[in-house]
Curated annotation (Swiss-Prot):
Broad enzyme group: transferase
UniProt xrefs under PANTHER family: 2,3,4,5-TETRAHYDROPYRIDINE-2,6-DICARBOXYLATE N-ACETYLTRANSFERASE (PTHR43300:SF10), ACETYLTRANSFERASE (PTHR43300)
Highest taxon above the source species: Bacteria
Pfam families given in the database record: DapH_N, Hexapep, Hexapep_2
GO MF annotations in UniProt: tetrahydrodipicolinate N-acetyltransferase activity
Name of the protein in its database record: 2,3,4,5-tetrahydropyridine-2,6-dicarboxylate N-acetyltransferase
Gene that this sequence comes from: dapH
Pathways per UniProt: Amino-acid biosynthesis; L-lysine biosynthesis via DAP pathway; LL-2,6-diaminopimelate from (S)-tetrahydrodipicolinate (acetylase route): step 1/3
PROSITE patterns assigned: HEXAPEP_TRANSFERASES
Gene Ontology BP terms: diaminopimelate biosynthetic process; lysine biosynthetic process via diaminopimelate
InterPro entries for this protein: DapH, DapH_N, Hexapep, Hexapep_transf_CS, Trans_hexapeptide_repeat, Trimer_LpxA-like_sf
Role: Catalyzes the transfer of an acetyl group from acetyl-CoA to tetrahydrodipicolinate.
Enzyme Commission no: 2.3.1.89
Annotated catalysed reactions: (S)-2,3,4,5-tetrahydrodipicolinate + acetyl-CoA + H2O = L-2-acetamido-6-oxoheptanedioate + CoA
Length: 235
């Protein structure tokens, strides 16, 4: 289910059960020992439990006399939104990217290492989110968009009445550019690297600077420089 309304997302986060998932590695005399609602792997002498921090702590305290060693791993605290299950996507998702649940990713899209995609975001068919780029909550990329390395599409949850960022089809956004809340970037526009876009961008233009201004219409030379490579999107 895709959540794109700010009020719905806020309600979802409020109502979600906040958990701290952990991996608990334990050695000892563990025959018959279990943790409620946990997944367990291993033997009676050495086990891995997938559980929560609270249940892990209770288990360790209750069974201290038979446990010889333990180790706890975790990467979040009281998290409300899980990561997206990407196993069924017809897209290329590289390791080290962070994609939260309730995100929509189209066919042949690419999400590179270090990219962050927040709840309610949309990535259209054939679009690429390059290394360390960020798509904030409700940010929308159309089809065949390139979001350059380190670029930011600002998220909009607060204030909830503000419109999300919309990047239309065929837009090229250079490295480290920032698209601020509520901005719409028109079809086939180009945003130069390092630009800060504070207002809507018409289709088919090139903008640059801080704040970004129109510097020219997109021409043949610009199209050649910003051409997408289909081979990067093939699966």
């Amino acid at each position: 289910m895709l959540l794109t309304n700010a009020y719905e997302i806020a309600q979802y986060i409020k109502d979600a059960k906040k958990e701290t998932p952990v991996k608990l590695y334990v050695n000892g005399q563990l025959a018959g020992l279990e943790i409620e609602e946990a997944k367990a792997f291993g033997t009676d002498e050495s086990k891995l439990f997938l559980t929560t921090a609270e249940r892990a702590a209770a288990f360790l305290e209750a069974n201290a006399s038979v446990i010889t060693d333990s180790h706890l791993e975790y990467d979040r605290r009281n998290s409300a939104v899980p990561m997206l299950d990407t196993t069924r996507l017809n897209a290329r998702i590289e390791p080290g990217s962070f994609i939260r649940d309730h995100v929509q990713i189209g066919n042949n899209a690419v999400v590179m290492m270090g990219a962050v995609v927040n709840i309610g975001a949309v990535i259209g068919d054939g679009s690429m989110v390059d290394m360390n780029a960020v798509i904030g909550a409700r940010g929308t990329l159309g089809k065949n968009v390139h979001l350059g390395a380190g670029a930011v599409v600002a998220g909009v949850l607060e204030p909830p009445s503000k419109d999300p960022v919309i990047i239309e089809d065929g837009v090229m956004i250079g490295a480290n550019a920032v698209i601020l809340e509520g901005v719409r970037v028109g079809e086939n526009a180009v945003v130069a690297a390092g630009s800060v876009v504070t207002q809507d961008v018409p289709p088919g233009v090139v903008v640059a600077g801080t704040p970004a201004r129109i510097i020219k219409q997109k021409d043949e030379k610009t199209s050649e420089k910003t051409q997408l490579v289909d081979d990067l999107r093939s699966l």
